[in-house]
Amino acid sequence: MVTIIDGEGLVLGRLASTVSKRLLDGEEITIINAEKIIISGNKDFIYAKYKQRVDRASISNPRDLGPKYPRRPDDIFRRTVRGMIPYRKAHGRAAYKNLKVNVGIPKELEGQEVVEVEQAQPKNITKSMELGTVSKLLGAKF
């Protein structure tokens, strides 16, 4: 059975750590509304950090040489989770394949039961930015 989690209003790092633990336990997880996941912190600092990562590609041949960092919100979340699991080992790669991330709510998932993640709820966050906003600033089209 697939666990569906709505990412709207949840904190990126807390949600990613919870999801990575569940993936390593063998669950299949689908995240919806990835563009509404929030990143806590100063907006200028958040944008500068992600912009630096995207611009870090090789000068000589940026299409072929890495590191390649994503711009889309669903891919940014997948990359965050990937950093929390041993994706180069067999069990980590198998766990990573059980993660599906969607922008918005796909038609086949409408009306299905959504699991609440209490650990990822924001607590006393005054400065934050949504993943969708970061992606648009980085030039993503989704």
Curated annotation (Swiss-Prot):
Belongs to the universal ribosomal protein uL13 family. Transmembrane segments: none annotated. This protein is one of the early assembly proteins of the 50S ribosomal subunit, although it is not seen to bind rRNA by itself. It is important during the early stages of 50S assembly. GO terms for molecular function: mRNA binding; structural constituent of ribosome. Gene3D superfamilies: Ribosomal protein L13 (3.90.1180.10). Keywords: Ribonucleoprotein, Ribosomal protein. SUPFAM superfamilies: Ribosomal protein L13. This is Large ribosomal subunit protein uL13. The gene is rpl13. It holds the Pfam family Ribosomal_L13. HAMAP family: Ribosomal_uL13. GO terms for cellular component: cytosolic large ribosomal subunit. Part of the 50S ribosomal subunit. GO terms for biological process: negative regulation of translation; translation.
